[in-house]
Amino acid sequence: MLIRIIPLLFFLSFIDAQIALPTFQAVHKPHTTTSTLSGTPENPLQSSLSTGLSITQYPYYWTYMMGYIFTPNVNGTITHIGGYFDGTKTTRLWQYSNGNLLASVSVPDPNYSWTYADITDVSVTAGTKYVVATAINGSGAANIRFVSDQLPNTYGNITINYSCYRSGSYDSDTYPSYWTLENRTDYTWGLSDVTFVPDE
């Protein structure tokens, strides 16, 4: 009888260990994979004013599409686009190399103040060039003159490479087939800008 009991006890202890195993594993917490934007938001062109630059307003000039070419120095996200101008205008974000439209939004009348409109978050890559530009439509423009510290300049984690504009009444989500000027270093017009949140 004893010979039969010993194997039975061994078998039961083996089953008990197997049953206990999932209970042991259940105490481990899963890793969180949800990412959130925790970096500090940056507005590169607006922050250029902290270096002593100033804005000049031009209420009745330019029917151009005007903005700047920029390069993030770290990976991150563009969460808003807009700028400093007067009157409701459309601001757009493109990838420079292929002209892909990344965002287009109507910015409510800033009345010559810095105003940014929400867009669907756009992930941007360090070292890749992008363009932000606003259709001025003949009114409410402004410019910044880079007197001694000409472009390219770095503000936070963004390098503004050059200012650019397309002359004529250009207001389209289609990337311009050419820029009238895209390598100006002493002025930027518009004034278009982005809100950039670096990855952390």
Predicted feature locations:
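Solvent-exposed serine/threonine-rich low-complexity stretches and specific carbohydrate-binding patches
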Residues: N100-N111
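Sec-dependent N-terminal signal peptides
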Residues: R4-S13
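Solvent-exposed, conformationally flexible loop/turn segments
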Residues: Y112-W114, G127
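Exposed aromatic-hydrophobic patches
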Residues: W114-D121
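Noncatalytic modules at the cell exterior or secretory-pathway interfaces
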Residues: V122-T134
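Beta-sheet-rich sandwich/jelly-roll-like modules and their strand-loop junctions
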Residues: F24-S97, A135-E200
